[in-house]
C-alpha cells in the first residue's frame, strides 16, 4: 500500500504540478487582467433601436483598448513563472558532453526560453503606443435592398460596378 502512495506522490511531483504551473503561466499570458478602470472605459450596450448606427470614428481605439492587458503581474503569477523557471532549468541542465562538440540548436532554444521567462520577471512591461491618427474608410449607405449587392457583400462576389450612377 505504501508503494502505491509513494508512486502516486512521485507522479504528482514529477508530472502533475510542473505541468499545472506551466499551464497557469501559459494561460495567463493570453488573458488580460481586469480592473475597475478598464471596466469603466468599455462602452455601454446599445439598445435595439440604435444597433444599426455604428460610430466608426472611435471603433479601432475601442477594439484596441478591449484587447490590451493592463501589464500587471501579481504575486501568484510571479510565483508560477519562478517555479517554471526552476523546473525548466533543472530539466534543461546540460549533460556531460565532450568539450569539442558544438552546442545544439535545442540547447540554444532552451537558453532563450529561460532568458525570456527571467526577463518577464525583471523587466517592467510597457504597453504599446496608441495610434491617434486613423484613416477612416468611406461607407456609402445603400438606399434599397438588392440581391446582387447582398451576395457581393456576404460572399465577396463582385461581377461589375457597385453603383451605376
From Swiss-Prot:
It is found in: Cytoplasm, Cytosol; Periplasm. GO terms for cellular component: cytosol; periplasmic space. GO terms for molecular function: translation regulator activity. Keywords: Cytoplasm, Periplasm, Signal. It comes from the Bacteria. Residues 1-37 form the signal peptide. InterPro entries: SecM. Its main location: cytoplasm. Belongs to the SecM family. Regulates secA expression by translational coupling of the secM secA operon. Translational pausing at a specific Pro residue 5 residues before the end of the protein may allow disruption of a mRNA repressor helix that normally suppresses secA translation initiation. This is Secretion monitor. It comes from Salmonella typhimurium (strain LT2 / SGSC1412 / ATCC 700720).
